[in-house]
Amino acid sequence: MGRRNLKNMSTENIVALCDVDWHYADKTFKDYPQAKRYKDWRQMFDEMGKSIDAVMVATPDHTHACVTAHAITLGKHCYTQKPLTHSVYESRLFTKLAKKYRVATQMGNQGNSFDWCRQITEWIQSGVIGEVYEVHCWTDRPIWPQGLMKPSDSPKCPKTLDWDLWIGPAEKRPYNPVYTPWNWRGWWDFGTGALGDMACHIMDPVYWALDLKYPTSVIGSSTLSNLYSPPHAQVVTYTFPARQQKG
């Protein structure tokens, strides 16, 4: 995701790149040979802060907050990938920081950036299909493992990966390939599961078109769940209050 975002910033001067696994990031590094490379984002800001106007954050969910919040306090404009944060507290913190430091912020959500999303919103709001009382959303996710138990083995960590930096603020544990580079989405300590990863894409257009606010109730059921990993499948029903008539 980060590499794709950077390709859409081809008109900008990319001065620094940061990734905890330089093997995984090799293709991106080669795309921008003039950019200085880092593993630790804190070191990047210390050394390159004066040369950086804005940052793009596309790390695993659990490290969005620490990187983005620090950047905002340094007066850097931020584009952070969805889901914006790993907790409600972090979202509220971002709101306070952005207001205090007056920087431009945006959450990356490609599902809400296409013309079809705006077109459907216009259709619904103009009454083309009449009143909408019920909407069904679904996804083929997870396409990564979920419903897993905590691994008991501890394979050797690749030399190119700084495991301590990858773990970041999460509870420390031995390296295991079941966590990274892709499967972190299916672990509560690092990701938000299929619902957190995809609802922002497929539910946001509904919120936009129907001008929805907060739900009055949320009821969920799922396959067997545990404290470590989101369930294999789930059904969640959101109920919203009646909307005020426009016009």
What are these language model-derived features?
Residues A65, A69, R92, F114-R118, ...:
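A structural signal for well-ordered alpha-helical segments within the folded catalytic domains
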Residues D164-K246:
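Rossmann-like dinucleotide-binding domain that binds NAD(P)(H)
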Residues M1-T80, T85, Y89-A104:
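N-terminal glycine-/serine-/threonine-rich beta1-alpha1-beta2 phosphate-ribose binding loop
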Residues L97-V103, S126-G130, L210-Y214, F240-G247:
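Secondary-structure transition/capping motifs at alpha-helix termini
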Residues H77-Y79, T85-L165:
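A contiguous active-site-proximal alpha/beta segment in oxidoreductase catalytic domains
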Residues P60-D61, L84, N109-G111, T139, ...:
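Short, flexible loop/turn elements at secondary-structure junctions
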Residues A16-C18, M56, Y133-H136, I167, ...:
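Residues embedded in well-ordered beta-strands within globular domains across many folds
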